[in-house]
Amino acid sequence: MHNKILVSSYILLVLLFSLSSFNIVVAKDGDESGNPFTPKGYVIRYWNKHVSNDLPKPWFLLNKASPLNAAQYATYTKLVADQNALSTHLQSFCSSANLMCAPDLLPSLEKHTGDIHFTTYGNKNFTNYGTNEPGIGVNTFKNYSEDASVNSFRRYGRGSPRDNKFDNYAPDGNVIDQSFNSYSTNTPGGSGQFTNYAPNTNVPDLRFTAYSDQGTGGEQEFKTYLEQGNSGGQSFKSYGKNGNGADSKFTSYGNETNVAASTFKNYGQNANGENQNFTSYSTNGNNPQNNFKNYGVGGNGPSETFTNYRDESNVGDDKFSNYVKDANAGEANFTNYGQSFNEGTDVFITYGKGGNDPHINFKTYGVNNTFKDYVKDTATFSNYHNKTSQDLASLSEVNGGKKVNNRWIEPGKFFREKMLKSGTIMPMPDIKDKMPKRSFLPRAIAAKLPFSTSKIDELKKIFHAANDSQVAKMIGDALSECERAPSPGETKQCVNSAEDMIDFATSVLGRNVVVRTTENTNGSKGNIMIGSIKGINGGKVTKSVSCHQTLYPSLLYYCHSVPKVRVYEADILDPNSKAKINHGVAICHVDTSSWGPRHGAFIALGSGPGKIEVCHWIFENDMTWATAD
């Protein structure tokens, strides 16, 4: 009996020792908690299996794996098999998986009397709020929607004469979605004021539908609206339509924005005696896009004024379709219009046609304008800048190999290879990642979700994305870019899991690979000094795979092969103290022959396609792959 107990104890000790050893091995191949059944644990094992070298693991990549724990991973893998089931658990899924999803806003039917002040609010739906509210007063929104994504104002202030003020609304937001539907409709008087609305935002989507429709008197003012915004768009549909004696003012609207789009549809249509003023609109912007359709059509005595419109911008396009058509009297004035540094395009189609004695004046306006079907007898054109081809070349092209008009290219964004020498002092651009923080989906979940433009309706249903929402636009844009045919000589793929990225990189470069990124953002937007520097693969011309983030609910990268490059690693020093502040990765494109002649690199550096190499830093959270040394 005693011997049996000893044998049993020995077996138990062996089993315990074996399990302990097993746990130690698993911890090496699992996530930081040592659990091999998490998505991150699987990605680490996948890296070990598919990458042939024993170099240190790229934790900046592996840490982008899904943060789901083992139980959550099992639950959502089961739910994704039934997309309706996943959709019903969307908010918990997005939160657990670190995705970017719009919140589901519940309608607000609350009533109030007196003046109401909203301070530091966000993610709220105002439906029927302030409807038919009597009396004179004001409702204010101050510091509203800071760092928030979605707000909806539906039938807000309908039939009420009260004033509404939005002060410092949605500042510094990322992928914000703000909608105003039937706002201040049928109002007798009252005013709306948007001051410092959505400044410094990244990819905003701002929508005003039937705003101030059938209003009487009152004034709607947008001051410092979307200033210094990046990309995104604004749409005004049926704004001020059927109004009576109302005024609208846009001052410093969209100034210093980057590739922002504005659409005005049925703006001021059939209005009586309305005044519309655009002052300093899209000034100093980079490639602003503005579209006015059915603007002021059928109005009675309208007054439309554009002053310093798209002044000093870089290219950009404006289109006016059916502008002030069938209007009775009234006037439209364009002063200092379209004086962009680099030539843009302005198209006027059916301008003032069918109107009764309209007065249309263009004073000091830019080149490359097209006027079709306008009232010649009542349109006045003065001081038209019809620049010669030589003048245009001095503005938008390279003249004599010198750098010209690089105000829209951030200092240090592009540079020559000779700058990558120890001791060089040079500017570094803003390399900070502007995208919202997200994680990869586990491959097992990503593979079961639709991912094509043909199934976009299914995706919108899963992610609760309304047809006109920013999330729906974001999904559509990403899928279209992913399905775009590759450029000549390019191999490309969109990857929404870490495993897919590993597969693509190794398919192009082989299994002996290294992935690199710039260590941090120190030195960004200032001068830096180059410290020690190393050329990857001996500094020889090589091939790499570059991966750049794309805006999507989950982390999504656009990866493509980049032939004929040289890749460098460099210590980045503070130019004053000489202390190391960063470790940067730079890539130099040796062959630029397929680049366009108006590429920002040539505007900043001079020369043209195929004549020079062009270098740039790898920005935060972007990465480049190369074969290991």
From Swiss-Prot:
The keyword Magnesium does not apply. It is found in: Secreted, Extracellular space, Apoplast; Secreted, Cell wall. Glycans are attached at residues 125, 143, 255, 277, 333, 368, 386. It comes from the Eukaryota. Residues 28-109 form a propeptide. The keyword Aminoacyl-tRNA synthetase does not apply. One of its GO terms (cellular component) is apoplast. Pfam families: BURP (PF03181). Keywords: Apoplast, Cell wall, Cell wall biogenesis/degradation, Glycoprotein, Secreted, Signal. Residues 267-293 have a biased composition (Polar residues). Residues 414-628 form the BURP domain. InterPro entries: BURP_dom, PG-associated_BURP. Residues 267-305 are annotated as: Disordered. One of its GO terms (biological process) is cell wall organization. Disulfide bonds: none annotated. PROSITE patterns: BURP. Residues 1-27 form the signal peptide. Interacts with polygalacturonase to form heterodimers. Non-catalytic subunit of polygalacturonase. This is Polygalacturonase non-catalytic subunit AroGP2. The gene is GP2.
